């Protein structure tokens, strides 16, 4: 996952190791003077192997783990920044509630929204909401792996009362989708199905929204040997535009698995492999 900043302190997680063997929550000042391990996951009821980001609200961190919990299908947890232990708000069962969340939570008011990458009634992941006190989880949608998509690995974004996200698989060609759904879960709309051509395929990260335009990356597809794309999608407009196809051979690298960020009139992001050094690249793309 990524780091989050509060004042002069960064918070983050590791997916492995630690005293409990299943990852950690840590803090470090922005000057890097010393790292503090705030919590070590055990892989038991507290969860284990977090792959997403933390969310800070007030004095409380919220997050998810991919594994652990009472059924081994991951948990939603809270952790006070001045505390010593996490509180498990929910343990996924791998049933209709889904299992194995890969992304991060978002917060609106006192409600958390997120996705699981697997299971659910449709067998291909879920969208859910849960109050910050963990009183009850509501499954807003279950992906089927068909035209609606399946197996989301990124996170949701919220605009007004509408959630937007992507799935890695499913859609009309099995190459993933872009979707929207109201926060009440009344109906999911597939905005776009990736074809695996110049538009890309299998998005692994999350979308960002600027004005009425969504930006994101697909981990494969494109015009350059299937090495992924950077794209835009205009809401209620012209649809999807492939902005760039990664070469997998030049300094741009290939297989972007995260999400871009917008700075001024430029998108910045990373690729996971290739590039002259062989380990991926950091890029900037002017809009």
Descriptions of predicted regions:
Residues 1-287:
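Extracellular beta-propeller repeat domains
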